[in-house]
UniProtKB/Swiss-Prot annotation:
Gene: rlmN
GO function terms (MF aspect): 4 iron, 4 sulfur cluster binding; metal ion binding; rRNA (adenine(2503)-C2-)-methyltransferase activity; rRNA binding; tRNA (adenine(37)-C2)-methyltransferase activity; tRNA binding
Family designation: Belongs to the radical SAM superfamily. RlmN family.
UniProt cofactor note: Binds 1 [4Fe-4S] cluster. The cluster is coordinated with 3 cysteines and an exchangeable S-adenosyl-L-methionine.
Organism for this UniProt entry: Bacillus velezensis (strain DSM 23117 / BGSC 10A6 / LMG 26770 / FZB42)
EC numbers: 2.1.1.192
NCBIfam families per UniProt: rRNA_mod_RlmN (TIGR00048)
Record-given protein name: Probable dual-specificity RNA methyltransferase RlmN
Note: Reaction proceeds by a ping-pong mechanism involving intermediate methylation of a conserved cysteine residue.
Record keyword ATP-binding present: no
Catalysed reactions, semicolon-separated: adenosine(2503) in 23S rRNA + 2 reduced [2Fe-2S]-[ferredoxin] + 2 S-adenosyl-L-methionine = 2-methyladenosine(2503) in 23S rRNA + 5'-deoxyadenosine + L-methionine + 2 oxidized [2Fe-2S]-[ferredoxin] + S-adenosyl-L-homocysteine; adenosine(37) in tRNA + 2 reduced [2Fe-2S]-[ferredoxin] + 2 S-adenosyl-L-methionine = 2-methyladenosine(37) in tRNA + 5'-deoxyadenosine + L-methionine + 2 oxidized [2Fe-2S]-[ferredoxin] + S-adenosyl-L-homocysteine
GO-annotated biological processes: rRNA base methylation; tRNA methylation
Compartments in which it is found: Cytoplasm
Any Gene Ontology CC annotation: cytoplasm
Amino acid sequence: MTQLKKTSVRKELRTEQPSIYSFELDEIKQWLTENGEKPFRAAQIFEWLYEKRVSSFDEMTNLSKSLREKLESNFVLTTLKTAVKQTSQDGTMKFLFELHDGYTIETVLMRHEYGNSVCVTTQVGCRIGCTFCASTLGGLKRNLEAGEIVAQVVKVQKALDETDERVSSVVIMGIGEPFDNFNEMLAFLKIINHDKGLNIGARHITVSTSGIIPKIYDFADQKMQINFAISLHAPNTEIRSRLMPINKAYKLPDLMEAVKYYIEKTGRRISFEYGLFGGVNDQVEHAEELAELLKDVKCHVNLIPVNYVPERDYVRTPRDQIFAFEKTLKSRGVNVTIRREQGHDIDAACGQLRAKERQDETR
């Protein structure tokens, strides 16, 4: 029987049977054809996976028994197990998922007036080394397969099924650097955006990067209508290098050139994430410098008050200073908002993922 392989995943990191969630519709059609089955069955399989969200291949009752047995022999549905689920006072939910090899990742469900947003993880750990973030404390263990990323959304959706709610948007801003796992991230995007997949609209999906410049050009060339964000966090090279060591490899001027290429190629505006760190990058003169950097750039700035991470030394910017920073940007014509804080009490806010678990492991 023909095995369906994805060359973008290193073989030694794969389970013996891959998750069927890792495969796009056309890839499943190919596998069906090569195994003597009708390709139209792929749409039925996708319906069972993403509309009915079954827990076993046996539940796919409009498929023949022999096909269900083939699926069972070649794939698993998911290797994610829910280890812990926490709920914040504001309704934010954090899921700790255990992977097939014992590693754990975190996924966050955020509730908004306009719907439910899921923040997914793309790597076990992170190699980028941002000096304010908990996710990078243990380094990078491995990349996730597309199916492990897709399964995060499916698992959260199944939790929402209990209250007849729906995942309405997805942000790729969890643990890891998405562009460090580029091919699997792209497969994930295509699966969740497909009308027979999770059918989440492109403009309801946001990808964020710390600034891996070659991949920004590659992503621009995809011409996807996905929302795109860059973790900027500084108005100049000196401060950005202090906060984000990646800036030493991928310089700020070169990053801004890549941003301009992306905007020209896609016609889309870009979002800049700007964490405010007390006494580091949060003064009015920093806002003036940021406005100058972003002059004539089609963009939006998200201001993020720093979240507490015990292993880090950064302090929160006072509230009145945050508003002064915002006011300065607005006066210079920069489109800007202050991000609403969510999940702070369960360590689910920006920069906090994996912090609590890592503390528990080292006790």
